[in-house]
Curated annotation (Swiss-Prot):
The keyword Flavoprotein does not apply. The gene is dnaA. Coiled coil: none annotated. It comes from Xanthomonas oryzae pv. oryzae (strain PXO99A). It comes from the Bacteria. This is Chromosomal replication initiator protein DnaA.
Length: 442
């Protein structure tokens, strides 16, 4: 079928070359008329495609082939019989390309049941559940989930959409990435089909858009989204959005759009703590049918601190090598397999780097951050830096104290507790913390 090569060409433009080469190019497509089957050489590739690429593949095949029903299977595409010579057909005038349809393309894999709850995401989980149970309620419409990449925002978005459709099977839930909204709008402008573009949003029950920070600087896109937002909000249709930061901090977003986004509920999704990271590793391992000892999960959770996606990447690497070599997964095997990955994590985040990042963020000189002065403008950033050192490195409290001009370990402990307590009530401090985590994880 010629739709799959066109789909693959689009995927090559959207995803890193190594991802396309590893997970997507091995796929073989078979058109069965009412569905399309993608064959993969092994179950591991099937799992990766289902988890990471299937929603986008469905959308592209629906556009290029008019068929978004996609199944994944292990094996090879059946050999087709030799076709009979085709008669010469009359020339058919080409038709204008249709606007890519916004058919429901939620990934059913992502549910509330398989979302691992922790202190960093429990408010976001509760808000997403409420949005699914009471769609359109002004208390959480729009629902905006913001935070660094790979923390579970899209999982919660999909879970809310899936829960909404489970409760109301006829519900029309539309999921888009922000660049898809932009591309479809540009295509509609080129084809003089803006009325058709706008009608797509009139009959839906919920609109889910990922990564709205990419609307920044695109004035016409923001104009269309602004009107779409107003129509959905007035019709009490649920809107769920994600962003990599608090929207008011996104330069290039129009003030009126920022104002609309603040109408409902905005919830930060923070990096997971150690316990949550360990639980995520164990949960993901169970999904893959892999036996991961607790001490291996603890090792990964201790070393991989930035986001859930990195945890999954480490787990995937571990499981793949175990499958290829036939070896059991032990702490020693994990340390050997993940050696370079773990070393890179440790080198990326150290106490000196944390101190410099915090000093730059708050506009301080390093000597002032490390000084004995206790003015509030210095004490709070210093406490933040100590708490980050405790959160992101393996250094002990005494070692952290030594790095901060020889302070006692009890001072470090107090700083960690103080910052954790303050973040529960101080939204600005929580945002500072999240930004610093993001900077240190880049």
């Amino acid at each position: 079928m010629d739709a799959w090569p066109r789909c693959l060409e689009r995927l090559e433009a959207e995803f890193p070359p190594e991802d396309v080469h590893t997970w997507l190019k091995p796929l073989q497509a078979e058109d069965r008329g009412d569905s399309i089957v993608l064959y993969a050489p092994n179950a591991f590739i099937v799992d990766q495609v289902r988890e990471r690429y299937l929603p986008r593949i469905r959308e592209l095949l629906a556009y290029f082939a008019g068929n978004g029903e996609v199944a994944l299977a292990v094996g090879s595409r059946p050999r087709a019989p030799e076709p009979a010579p085709a008669p010469v057909a009359a020339t058919i005038a080409p038709q204008a390309a249709p606007i890519a349809p916004f058919a429901g393309n939620l990934d059913s894999h992502y549910t509330f049941a398989n979302f691992v709850e922790g202190r960093s995401n429990q408010l976001g989980l509760a808000a997403a559940i409420q949005a699914a149970q009471k769609p359109g309620d002004r208390a959480h419409n729009p629902l905006l989930l913001y935070g660094s990449t790979g923390l579970g925002k899209t999982h919660l978005m999909f879970a809310a959409g899936n829960a909404l459709r489970q409760a109301k099977p006829a519900a029309k839930v539309m999921y888009l990435r922000s660049e898809q909204f932009f591309s479809a709008m540009i295509r509609a402008l080129q084809d003089k089909a803006m009325d058709q573009f706008k009608r797509q949003f009139q009959q839906i029950d919920a609109l889910l858009i990922d990564d709205i920070q990419f609307f920044a600087g695109k004035d016409r896109t923001q104009e269309e989204f602004f009107h779409t937002f107003n129509a959905l909000f007035d019709g009490r249709q649920q809107i769920i959005l994600t962003c990599d930061r608090y929207p008011r901090e996104v330069e290039g977003l129009e003030p009126r759009l920022k104002s609309r986004l603040a109408w409902g509920l905005s919830v930060a999704i923070d990096p997971p703590d150690f316990e949550t990271r360990a639980a995520i590793v164990l949960a993901k391992a169970r999904e893959r049918g892999a036996e991961i000892p607790d001490d291996v999960a603890f090792l990964i959770a201790k070393k991989m601190r930035s986001n859930v996606r990195d945890l999954e990447g480490a787990l995937n690497t571990l499981v793949a090598r175990a499958n290829f070599t036939g070896r059991s997964i032990t702490v020693e095997f994990a340390q050997e397999t993940l050696r370079d990955l773990l070393r890179a994590q440790q080198q990326a985040i150290g106490i000196p780097n944390i101190q410099k990042t915090v000093a730059d963020y708050y506009g301080l000189q390093m000597k002032d951050l490390l000084s004995k002065r206790r003015t509030r403008s210095l004490a709070r950033p210093r406490q933040v830096a100590m708490a980050l050192a405790k959160e992101l490195t393996e250094h002990s409290l005494p070692e952290i104290g030594d790095a901060f001009a020889g302070r006692d370990h009890t001072t470090v402990l107090h700083a960690c507790r103080q910052i954790r307590t303050l973040m529960e009530a101080d939204g600005k401090l929580r945002e500072d913390w999240e930004k610093l985590i993001r900077k240190l994880s880049e």
